[in-house]
Design a protein with these regions (language model features):
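Residues that define the transmembrane beta-barrel architecture of outer-membrane proteins
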Residues: 27, 50-54, 103-107, 128-130, ...
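Residues on the lipid-exposed face of transmembrane beta-strands in outer-membrane beta-barrel proteins
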Residues: 33-37, 58-62, 109-113, 136-140, ...
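Outer-membrane beta-barrel channels and translocator barrels
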Residues: 26, 63-67, 116-118, 164-166, ...
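Structural signature of outer-membrane beta-barrel domains
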Residues: 38-40, 77-81, 116, 139-143, ...
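Predominantly the C-terminal beta-signal and adjacent terminal strand-loop region
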Residues: 104, 166-229
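Gram-negative (and chloroplast) outer-membrane scaffold detector with strong preference
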Residues: 66-147
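Short glycine/proline- and aromatic-enriched beta-strand/turn motifs that initiate or cap beta-hairpins
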Residues: 21-61, 210, 214-220
């Protein structure tokens, strides 16, 4: 079998499998909100669990099939930290400790993959109400406070679990780390006074632990859900 025939066969198989999966899920979209804790991870934070602040988000999710989806989210929170919280020696802040409290706005688009087919079991044979999942994507970060404004990109990576409460309600718990491209989310660039290079070398990041609740809508088979729509 030639390479061209093999590629054609694989493409046809993938197209058929995707089309079959897309006809099995009930709803195309989810919309909802999340609430949880946001934590700054950078030069002025000694622990992942330190300086956690309340945060909230709005979520819009496009469902491709019981395994895959794309989530668009906007998150609001606070980033706080202090040089007193770390054991690292910073020459500039020995006599005058540094602290900050900045406002964070994050917008991201992430690809999600469910380890098990997700659903009620009626729309897709073998679907489960509970599944763990992983996600990753791209985001934008805007931080303001202390007279400084920072706008940069970030790479969110995370994992979570979700549970289908009912045909239209979905409960999720997720944790993500947002790796930013800036070292000034805390208002200070390179407090070590050592030049560094590389895409993520000595840059700041932040994590978010959130509980989300979403509502499913836009039925794929409208004639099957006229009573619900």
């Amino acid at each position: 079998m030639t390479m061209k025939k093999i590629l054609t066969f694989l493409l046809m198989t993938l197209t058929f499998a995707t089309a079959k999966a897309q006809t099995d899920d009930e709803y195309r979209m989810e919309i909802g909100a999340g609430v949880g804790l946001v934590s700054y991870e950078g030069d002025f934070n000694g622990s992942v669990l330190s300086n956690m602040q309340m945060g909230g988000s709005v979520v819009l999710r496009r469902i491709f099939n019981p395994y895959m989806g794309v989530k668009m989210a906007a998150m609001y929170g606070k980033l706080t930290g202090s040089s007193k919280d770390v054991k690292t020696y910073y020459p500039d802040f020995v006599s005058n400790p540094y602290s900050f409290s900045n406002t964070l706005v994050d917008a991201s688009v992430t690809y999600e993959y469910n380890f098990w087919p997700y659903g009620t079991g009626r729309d897709y044979r073998g679907a489960k109400r509970f599944t763990p999942f992983v996600f990753g994507g791209l985001g934008a970060t805007f931080v303001t406070g202390g007279g400084n404004n920072v706008f940069t990109a970030n790479v969110p990576l995370g994992l979570g679990v979700k549970y289908k409460i009912g045909p239209r309600l979905n409960l999720g718990l997720e944790w993500a780390v947002h790796f930013s491209l800036s070292d000034k989310l805390d208002g200070v660039k390179d407090p070590y006074n050592i030049e560094s290079s590389g895409l993520f070398k000595n840059t700041d990041c932040y994590s978010a632990l959130q509980l989300t609740l979403t509502y499913s809508f836009m039925a794929k088979c409208r004639t099957c859900h006229n009573a619900d729509e």
